[in-house]
């Protein structure tokens, strides 16, 4: 059903108050704090670990499906657009951002996870960043702030907060990191000049972080940068160039969600000048810069390449190490695989890289989830490992890899020492009319990992969803979602009942037993 969309009252909005009072009657006692969502946002949590709270059900049937893009940006093979992750509450409400079309914008829908019945919907006036028009269309930024509220990007760099996510009815409120009164006074100017450019990330205290763009002459002196909305509703921001300590830095990397340390005190994200990037660390309360590292190609030592068609975001490991995927320079020298750069928590020590980084966010697997693993690392990483079919370069043997961040081997595709391959699995389907051994790509930018069963849920461009058993290294299950389609990479998600959510050809599928 349609919901009321109204701005918040003047002055700071207390997010904590909204969480406690939304829907409370008269003198009723405030309810206890909401439970933790099953899947809060991109890659599951603020560290982007990709870990599930429930083991996936067997892949035997499609329970329900919904279209996530009604006017996809098409090419011959399939849609080339990044889509926002579905979010799932502990009560099994699935929040799905939907692209209606280039001119009609976006909306957000809430579904009952058990049967796919739509419970609510609301539109957003969000517009995509002006600078993204030459890249694959970006997703609409959204995150569950807690188990009862969703934050969605709105027009002019604002955030729309929908309360009572698990209920049919709920109010939608608007908040602006630069002040709602300023937005009201200069609505048209803000809407024309300011857009949110990254997925939203929720901190452990309920703060929301995101990158934004601001055109020249934007109201309030805004410049491209990073914003925070605190649990009490107060906004703050910092220019991208101040985060990097370099005036030439122009913006936050498009589509790259901020990642947070496990204690929530340090955030990480990429800033760019043209296609040259820096990974920066910042204080999550004050937004003051803490750390910075210029990103380089491990093979050529040239500047690594950051482009807007990538959705790569940092991952924070259990030990605080930070991982971030980049393209090489030149990109063809490593078969357009890119590199997974690996840093300590202070970004001062560059560790062994991974042999793939293009448009991916690695997921984290406790080493105890892989009984046959004989190494010494406490955790492992799941990485896309495609070797794209490019004449004179890649052979089209596209894989996923389980990598050991604490061990090294010689790269199969260069002379660089890279993270050790614990397991790899080749995609199973030959591409028609291509050389023998050239298989469909693994179509993933973030995969759901189940620590309990030691398995990974991964999409493939052959139209199937697969379960990869990390202990045996075998693809043990699959289900057909649709016809083969070349498309921008998508994520997998697992809900609290074990339903797996996967996208193929602009459709979200709910899969289980």
What are these regions (language model features)?
Residues 4, 16-20, 43, 491:
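Exposed boundary/loop context
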Residues 33-42, 49-80, 88-96, 101-138, ...:
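Extracytoplasmic/lumenal domain signature
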Residues 1-12:
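Bacterial N-terminal signal peptides that target proteins for export
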Residues 11-14, 56:
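Low-complexity, intrinsically disordered regions enriched in charged/polar residues
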Residues 18-36, 48:
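C-terminal region of N-terminal signal peptides and the immediate post-cleavage residues
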Residues 5, 17, 31, 416-417:
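Intrinsically disordered, low-complexity serine/threonine-rich segments
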């Amino acid at each position: 059903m349609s919901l009321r969309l109204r701005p918040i009252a003047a002055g700071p909005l207390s997010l904590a108050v909204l969480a406690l009072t939304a829907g409370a009657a008269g003198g009723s006692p405030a309810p206890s704090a909401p439970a933790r969502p099953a899947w809060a946002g991109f890659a599951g949590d603020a560290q982007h670990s990709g870990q599930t709270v429930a083991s996936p059900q067997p892949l035997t049937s499609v329970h329900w499906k919904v279209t996530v893009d009604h006017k996809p940006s098409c090419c011959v093979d399939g849609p080339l657009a990044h889509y926002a992750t579905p979010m799932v509450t502990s009560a099994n409400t699935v929040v799905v951002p939907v692209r209606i079309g280039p001119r009609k914008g976006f909306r957000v829908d809430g579904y009952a996870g058990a049967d796919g019945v739509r419970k609510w919907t609301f539109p957003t006036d969000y517009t995509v960043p002006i600078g993204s028009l030459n890249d694959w269309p970006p997703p609409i930024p959204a995150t569950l702030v807690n188990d009862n509220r969703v934050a969605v990007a709105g027009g002019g760099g604002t955030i729309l907060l929908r309360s009572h996510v698990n209920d049919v009815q709920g109010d939608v409120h608007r908040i602006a990191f630069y002040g709602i009164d300023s937005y009201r006074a200069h609505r048209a100017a803000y809407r024309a000049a300011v857009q949110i450019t990254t997925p939203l990330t929720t901190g452990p205290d309920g703060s929301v972080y995101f990158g934004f763009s601001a055109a020249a002459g934007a109201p309030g002196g805004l410049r491209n940068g990073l914003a925070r909305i605190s649990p009490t509703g107060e906004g703050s921001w910092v220019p991208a160039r101040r985060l990097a300590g370099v005036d030439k830095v122009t913006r936050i990397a498009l589509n790259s969600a901020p990642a947070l340390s496990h204690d929530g005190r340090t955030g990480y994200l990429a800033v760019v000048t043209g296609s040259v990037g820096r990974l920066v660390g910042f204080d999550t309360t004050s937004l003051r810069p803490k750390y910075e590292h210029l990103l380089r190609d491990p093979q050529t030592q040239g500047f690594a390449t950051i482009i807007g068609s990538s959705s790569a975001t940092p991952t924070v490991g259990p030990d605080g190490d930070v991982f971030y995927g980049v393209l090489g320079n030149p990109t063809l020298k490593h078969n357009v695989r890119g590199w997974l750069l690996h840093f300590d928590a202070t970004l001062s020590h560059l560790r062994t890289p991974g042999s793939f980084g293009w448009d991916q966010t690695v997921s984290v697997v406790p080493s105890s989830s892989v009984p046959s693993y004989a190494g010494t690392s406490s955790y492992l990483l799941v990485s896309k490992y495609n070797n794209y079919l490019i004449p004179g370069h890649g052979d089209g043997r596209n894989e996923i890899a389980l990598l050991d961040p604490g061990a090294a081997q010689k790269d199969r595709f260069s002379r660089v020492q890279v993270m050790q391959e614990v397991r790899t699995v080749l995609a199973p389907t030959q591409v028609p009319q291509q050389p023998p051994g050239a298989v469909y790509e693994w179509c993933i930018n973030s995969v759901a990992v189940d620590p309990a069963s030691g398995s990974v849920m991964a999409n493939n461009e052959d139209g199937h969803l697969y379960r990869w058993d990390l202990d045996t290294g075998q693809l043990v299950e699959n289900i057909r979602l649709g016809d083969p389609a070349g498309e921008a990479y998508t994520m997998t998600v697992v809900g609290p009942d074990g339903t797996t959510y996967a996208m193929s050809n602009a459709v979200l599928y709910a899969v289980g037993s």
